[in-house]
Structure formats: structure tokens, C-alpha cells
Amino acid sequence: MKNISVFCGAHEGNNPRYAEDAKKIGEILAAKGINVVFGGGNVGLMKIVSDAALDNGVDAIGIGLESLHNLELVNPRLKNQIITKTLLDRKDEFMKRSDAFIVLPGGVGSLDELAELMANNQLGLINKPVGLLNTEGYYDHLLAWMRKAVEEDFITEANFNDLIVSSSCEDLINLIIENERPDNDDWTKRLGL
């Protein structure tokens, strides 16, 4: 794997573990020689994960919105920035430039990105591992909702199980790497279609 997108909050949250885990993710990816693709921001968990990657010798590729770029909210340390006009264009760039995805604690934007990734994998528009870092149970309620959606037959068991979930940064990254998919992987079989 060459590039992994990390989606996370533009804020640090009120639990110091979120920032600690964001830093660990950047450090672990760097130790494995994997570049970080992220939202380009110079704030919150985005700044922490990108700085950790840059401090440890890999590239951080920022994919930001023109509106935020104009407000000078972009990490000034970035050598590689892609600026998009819309959120849809931004998510498309993430999907094109990444071999896998990690979602850390975050808000509505992180939830939107997670849902888009799961839907794109389900439809076969992408075929890439998606990991969810469940720091101190942050995503427990979301996972419970997903399980309920599986029970009610709105999400397939296979699509739910395709999401890689861990509360450990190291374990999550290792599971994502183990689940790297060849270009010719038949996603329909993996999802039970």
C-alpha cells in the first residue's frame, strides 16, 4: 500500500485519547512507509495526523475545499495539495488517490465519508479496505445502528462485515494491510451478491 486516506475531525474533541490516536495513526503509517491522504486542514485531528506523518518521513497529501483554502485553514507544511470546488469532487479525489481508508473520531463530515465509502464498496465502484477506529467506544452507537440495520435487512451482513473495526491503532492498520485487495478481486462474491 502506498497511500491511505485518514478521515477525522477538524476539532480534537474533548477526550485526549482522540489526539493521541490520531498521532499514533500518522506515526504507524509512516513507519510502514505509507503516505497519509487527508482533508488538508491545519486544525483538529487532521493537523495532528498529518504532522505525525510528515514528522516521520512520509508525505501528507491534502485534499481540501477551495472555500477552506481561501480561509488559510490548510496545513502550510504540505508539498502536495489538491483543491476541489465541491465535497463530491473532494471525496472522488480521495477514492482515486488512496489504497485504503481509515475513519477516526469525527463529526458529520467523517460520518458522510464513511457512508460514502461503504456504499461505493457495496456497489463495486471501489474495492478498497475501510477501517473504523473505535477509540474508547466512540462509534459504539453507530455500530449498534448498523447491526440493527442488518437485522432489519437494510444493510447486508457482508457489507457490514466488510468494515474493519478496531479500538487499537496498530491492529486496525495491520488488518487493513492484510485485507489489501487485488485489482481483479470479485467484490460481488465478497459481499455475497
For each feature predicted by the language model, list its residue ranges.
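Active-site/ligand-binding-proximal alpha/beta "capping" segment
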Residues: D89-G124, G131, P182-R190
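Arginine/glycine-rich "motif VI" loop of SF2 helicases in the C-terminal RecA-like domain
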Residues: L54, N121-K128, F154-I155
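Hydrophobic "lid"/C-terminal helical patch
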Residues: I176
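A cross-family phosphate/adenosyl-ligand binding-site feature
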Residues: M1-R97, E136-E170, R181-L193
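Short beta->alpha connector loops at strand-helix junctions that form conserved
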Residues: G40, G64, T84-K85, L104-G106, ...
